[in-house]
Amino acid sequence: MRSFLALLCALGAATASAQPSTVPADGGDIVITPLVHASVQVEHGGTVILVDPWSVADFSSVPPADLILVTDDPGHHLDPEAIARLRAPGVPVVVTAAARERFGDGTVLGNGERGTFAGVAVEAVAAYDMTPGRPFHPKGEANGYVVTLGGRRLFFAGVGECVPEIQALEGIDVAFMPMNLPVDRMRPRPVAECVKTFRPGIVYLNHYDQTYATWLGTREGDPPPDRQDTPATIRAFAQALDGEGIEFRDAAWYPPR
């Protein structure tokens, strides 16, 4: 309980950090930098991986990627402009079958398939929804990814709910999990219960401010006001994990309004 109370104090006293954090690994630390929404940069041993790069992020300090992973086909996951900016010639871009229709210069991994790209082992994990609603992700159209770096396994869930394929994951060291707000799927406690099924050492929440993300993609009109319930939902997630031995790292995934 003491660790949870300390976390609550930290959440209340400061804004979440978008600064890089590290994970010990063979051959040196893995450096993780949240960018925006579902977009994240991972570096290890000189290799740079970008997941769902999106042009609304500040790329001024983002190095060219050695590998790009795309989890879904909407613009906040698949952004050809961002890929072109951050991709050197010949750099592999791993996409879903649905994304291939919008981005022809990518390598498709279907759910459950594996491959090695830029020397990095990648496994595609099914990402889909089971609860009706909009948006809805049918099975087979989106991917999560397990990436192995320095003996560590990192899981990027992308989109979707806590499907059996996620619950069956083993040996995950770091997980990035979506919390879809205001869509009534993957609320904080269900996300926490999902995390408990496969027990990563560290978990990040991302992909949670859908209303603001939609505005970021269009810039039409004034930005929506801050969601007053976002800090409370993040605290609810942290509370649901209290005592589980899973480290929750809060991060700033969105630019200031």
Walk through the language-model features, giving the residues of each.
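Proline-aspartate-enriched helix->loop->beta-strand connector
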Residues: 172-176, 188-211
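A short acidic, amphipathic alpha-helical/loop segment
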Residues: 81-86, 165-168, 189-194
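Active-site metal-binding motif and surrounding structural segment of the metallo-beta-lactamase
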Residues: 55-98, 170-176, 199
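Core dinuclear metal-dependent hydrolase active-site scaffold
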Residues: 19-63, 108-170, 252-257
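Binuclear metal-ion centers of metallo-dependent hydrolases, dominated by the metallo-beta-lactamase
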Residues: 107-115, 201-257
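Charged helix-capping and loop-helix junction motifs
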Residues: 138-141, 187-194, 223-231
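Structural recognition of the beta-strand scaffold that forms the well-ordered cores
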Residues: 34, 48-52, 69, 94-95, ...
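Bacterial N-terminal signal peptides
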Residues: 3-14
